[in-house]
Each structure stands twice: as C-alpha cells, then as structure tokens.
Amino acid sequence: MKKNVQIKGTKDGISIFLSDKASILELQQELSQLLADKKQNPYSGEKLEVQVQIGNRLFSEEEELEISTIIHNNSQMEISAFYSNVMSKDDAKKWKERDQIFSMATIIRSGQVVQVPGDFLLIGDVNPGGQIRSNGNVFVLGNIKGIIHAGFEGDKNAVVAGKFLYPSQVRIADKVYGFDSEDYKEVVDTDLFSAFVNDTDEIVIDEIHKIRKIRPEISNFQGGR
C-alpha cells in the first residue's frame, strides 16, 4: 500500500511529501507515527529546513499550522514552505491582473491617482499633479505632465511610453527621472518616447521603437480591460 507521508532527499534538500488522496486527519496520524519512528534519526541535534509538498490540493492556514506543529514537536525539522501544484482563487486573480492590460480614455487631472495591478494604457493626457501607478508597464497616447510610476512594486523591467513634457516625472521601481528643468519648459509638443532602466541601473529616455529591442516581450501583449 502506498504511503501517504514520505520523507525524501531532493536536489533542493529534504522534502516531506503528503498525499493529496488522504484526508488531513490521515496525514496528521501518519506523519506523527513516521516522525515518532524516526526519533533516533540523523536529523536530531541540528535544525534542518524542510519543504512540504502537498500535491494537487490547498491547505487552509489552520491545516498548515497543524502540520507545522506536528513536525516541530516531533523532530528537529523546521518548515521553510508549503508547496502546492494548484493555485488559490486569490492567487489566480492576482496573476490574471498582473498579466492584463488595463485601459482608460480620459484625462488624469491634478490630484487624481490611478493605480492598476497590471499594464496600463491611457488614451488621453496626464495633467500636472495627476499620477498613474502601475505594477507593470505604462503607455500614454497623449501628453504627460504629471507623474508616471511603472513597476510600482519594484519591477525594474517595466517601461513607460508617451510624450514627456514639463514638469512630468517618470518613476520605474525606485528610480526617478524628472522633466522639470528649464530645458523642457518651452517644449510644447514632442514625439512619443520610451523610458526604461538600463544596465547601469539608471532611467534612460530613448526613441519609442527602442522598446522592442530592450523589452522584446512587450510586442506579445494581448488582451485588455
């Protein structure tokens, strides 16, 4: 009969495999017995991190805590993480949002802050004092005079494209580039340009067609909202 609980050494270290065919009660009982049988094992005397593989199922926080407690109380092992082959509804929703292009046709006025979890396409202008925050890339088909923050949660591979005018500011992750100097004050129109973080960790402003070379994956974007 196949065991519901197995401890194996893998290339990533020690893993505990819990069958997704067994009930949580069966797993708890079998895990407790297995660890009790291994009391005199080579793991004792030193804490070892283990991964818990739970297959095609998800554990609640309470179930994870119960498994963690059994391992903590009956061995010298500590859980580094639980790994599942499936995704929760919340995680799936977040993944879908990150992989999606959000779009609006409007003017972002002073005091307005638009924040999206994925890429963002704006058909319209961003006025001084207006702000866009996107976890992904930002594309503006209009004049940018406000603040554009791409890669808001730290993605330095994000890019910004649009017409950058005084006194706009571009932020990518934690990098900042300002168009607030006197050189930009007299510019009333410009072509579309792109902004991205280069190999020296600085924001560079370049011609729009350079995006395809710098970030070739952008040409594969699909979808919208």
From Swiss-Prot:
Keywords: Cell cycle, Cell division, Septation. GO terms for biological process: cell morphogenesis; division septum assembly; regulation of cell septum assembly. SUPFAM superfamilies: Cell-division inhibitor MinC, C-terminal domain. InterPro entries: CAP/MinC_C, MinC, MinC_C_sf, MinC_N_1, Septum_form_inhib_MinC_C. Interacts with MinD and FtsZ. NCBIfam families: PRK00513.1-3. Cell division inhibitor that blocks the formation of polar Z ring septums. Rapidly oscillates between the poles of the cell to destabilize FtsZ filaments that have formed before they mature into polar Z rings. Prevents FtsZ polymerization. Belongs to the MinC family. This is Probable septum site-determining protein MinC.
